[in-house]
Amino acid sequence: MEPAFWDASALVPLCVQQIATPSAQAAGKIYSVVVWWATPVEIRSAMARLVRMSLLTPNQHVGAQARLAELRSKWHEISPDPSLRDQAERLLDRFTLKAADALQLAAALAWTSGRPRARAFISRDAQLLEAARQLGFQDLRI
């Protein structure tokens, strides 16, 4: 399986049944998962929001957490460090990104050693995908 950097927005549909779940599952058959260190926090935040909005029952939440644990056991995680933070700050000057998205994109760049050409970046966030594309990633929207 070819590795790809997955944004949290692309992983939530692998944990919770959503419209994007079939697309995420198809991508999961082609690409292994590389993530930023804080991705589990972002996914858990999305799950908690769905519970609060009554879009996810407590039983579904338990199942989603189990699916997240399974994903985590297989993915490769990029750890934070000062150079990654510095890169994220530079990305904020160049692109219209939220702080967490800049950190994700900086982690993706660290994963590719600054050579993203033709490496897949998977997300549901159009702004983040556009920034990734401009940096040279192959952007895959699910």
Task: Give the ranges of each region predicted by the language model.
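Short beta-strand scaffold positions
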Residues: 6, 35, 79, 99-102, ...
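Short glycine/serine- and small hydrophobic-enriched flexible loop segments
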Residues: 45-52, 109-110
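Short, well-structured N-terminal submotif of metal-dependent ribonuclease cores
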Residues: 1-40, 50-63, 137
